[in-house]
Amino acid sequence: MNQDSGCEGVGEVVRVMPAVVDVEFAHGGLPDILHALKSEKDYQGKQLVLEVAQHLGDGVVRCVAMGSTDGLSRGDKFINTGSPISVPVGRKTLGRVFDVLGEPIDGVGDVGADVEYHSIHAHAPKLSEQKVATEVLVTGIKVIDLLAPYLKGGKVGLFGGAGVGKTVLIMELISNIARAHKGFSVFAGVGERTREGNDLYREMVESGVINEDEREKSQAVLVYGQMNEPPGARMRVALSALTMAEYFRDAEGQDVLFFVDNVFRFTQSGSEVSALLGRVPSAVGYQPTLASEMGAMQERITSTHKGSITSVQAIYVPADDLTDPAPSTSFLHLDSTTVLSRQISELGIYPAVDPLDSTSQALSVDVVGAEHYEVAREVQRILQTYKSLQDIIAILGMDELSQEDKILVARARKIQRFLSQPFHVAEVFTGNPGVFVSLEDTVRSFKGLVEGQYDDLPEAAFYMVGGIDAAVEKAKALK
């Protein structure tokens, strides 16, 4: 956080609750809402920063703590910085790992004195400055590129319950896209496991996205507020990362990739803070300001005439319920939704993307072309028909189906297995080398499948392969 802000007053702590602190400014200098306060002394070896959330009257402000309040007591002094929390931006941040306050946590040292700092609270670009995305972003993952393609400069949500593969999928997307991407990537770790943050950093170093010898030649910035941190830090870390991404978009005209894992934790931390601030909860116990908080963040993630931000957001779905207010509020802001299904993961098909639930605004003739659109819709039609026949198959068996339906079911099962794919990031666990499948190969492969060109191949040949040529080779090996 910027240390050069001018002081406007000193306050005294009058009440301490977990993650929320009341500070009294008896002699004037009352801070504005969203302004930062810094402690005069250190706690656990570092200054504690508070963000003003409410004015309670009589010179008392209620603040959200950005760090642990252990050791804090009544009477402790806090200085009004006169400005919101600010984080470093620009090329000096590349290859580094930061916390919510923009402090480096990678043990490499400070970012330097000649670094620009920007407030984490900013307005979304005006409508006249925004640009509509129409170019498809190829991910190399068959099920996504075919059925729910991503737009360059668009917003993507990866929805899924616990343990269905959201983080693995987002790491594979980083591996596939960030390597080939010429611009910069910013990753926001919001309330997820510290181990996963460490794994991602190591993965980026190995793939060359982060250069440990010459940091400024790196292509990525990591900002972490993990699940062991107070709710204030988890609530603001996405904004800290977004501020860094906005700088690359606006000041440098870059096409930026912005990854968030996990947006649900952003909502969850807001709910914790809202309860501590004494607000009346709304549906399912969430904060009454859920829609406006989500909107304030999501509206900043957009593409302008200067540059673009393509965002991929992992969104945890509590109890696999997509109607829960947290995931359903996110749906409104997204161009593409990739829904991960527990039923598909139980079949051992990974990535466990639901081909019928996942949607994309890009899946139109105008964007992807007639051939791609027709193949995708035919794949969905076959899978939907198979789904509707499953009850009949379970009760009466395959023999009761017409010959036409039997062929369609066999084709659907092959398509279902062909939607699986070995990942680069999972290679160490599965032993299968990861595969990047081009869009042309994906469309060609599925076109052949829906036309019945590969009806003679066994189902097993289509499981965990890349393109159709690999499936044909596997079928020969199985004979």
Swiss-Prot record:
Q: Where is ATP bound in this sequence? A: G160, G161, A162, G163, V164, G165, K166, T167
Subcellular location(s): the record lists:
Cell inner membrane
List, alphabetically, the GO terms of the cellular component aspect: plasma membrane; proton-transporting ATP synthase complex
The family note in this entry says: Belongs to the ATPase alpha/beta chains family.
State the function annotated in the UniProt record: Produces ATP from ADP in the presence of a proton gradient across the membrane. The catalytic sites are hosted primarily by the beta subunits.
UniProt cross-references to Gene3D superfamilies, sorted A to Z: 2.40.10.170, Bovine Mitochondrial F1-atpase, Atp Synthase Beta Chain, Chain D, domain 3, P-loop containing nucleotide triphosphate hydrolases
Query: What organism is listed for this UniProt entry?
Result: Anaplasma phagocytophilum (strain HZ)
What does the record give as EC number? 7.1.2.2
Alphabetically, the GO molecular function entries are:
ATP binding; ATP hydrolysis activity; proton-transporting ATP synthase activity, rotational mechanism
Subunit (UniProt): F-type ATPases have 2 components, CF(1) - the catalytic core - and CF(0) - the membrane proton channel. CF(1) has five subunits: alpha(3), beta(3), gamma(1), delta(1), epsilon(1). CF(0) has three main subunits: a(1), b(2) and c(9-12). The alpha and beta chains form an alternating ring which encloses part of the gamma chain. CF(1) is attached to CF(0) by a central stalk formed by the gamma and epsilon chains, while a peripheral stalk is formed by the delta and b chains.
Provide the primary localization.
membrane
Say if the entry is tagged with keyword Cell division.
no
- Top-level taxonomy: Bacteria, Pseudomonadati, Pseudomonadota, Alphaproteobacteria, Rickettsiales
In the bilayer, the protein is annotated as: Peripheral membrane protein
Q: Which reaction does it catalyse?
A: ATP + H2O + 4 H(+)(in) = ADP + phosphate + 5 H(+)(out)
Which UniProt keywords are listed? ATP synthesis, ATP-binding, Cell inner membrane, Cell membrane, CF(1), Hydrogen ion transport, Ion transport, Membrane, Nucleotide-binding, Translocase, Transport
Q: Which InterPro entries match?
A: AAA+_ATPase, ATP-synt_VA_C, ATP_synth_F1_bsu, ATPase_a/bsu_AS, ATPase_alpha/beta_chains, ATPase_F1/V1/A1_a/bsu_N, ATPase_F1/V1/A1_a/bsu_N_sf, ATPase_F1/V1/A1_a/bsu_nucl-bd
- This one is known as ATP synthase subunit beta
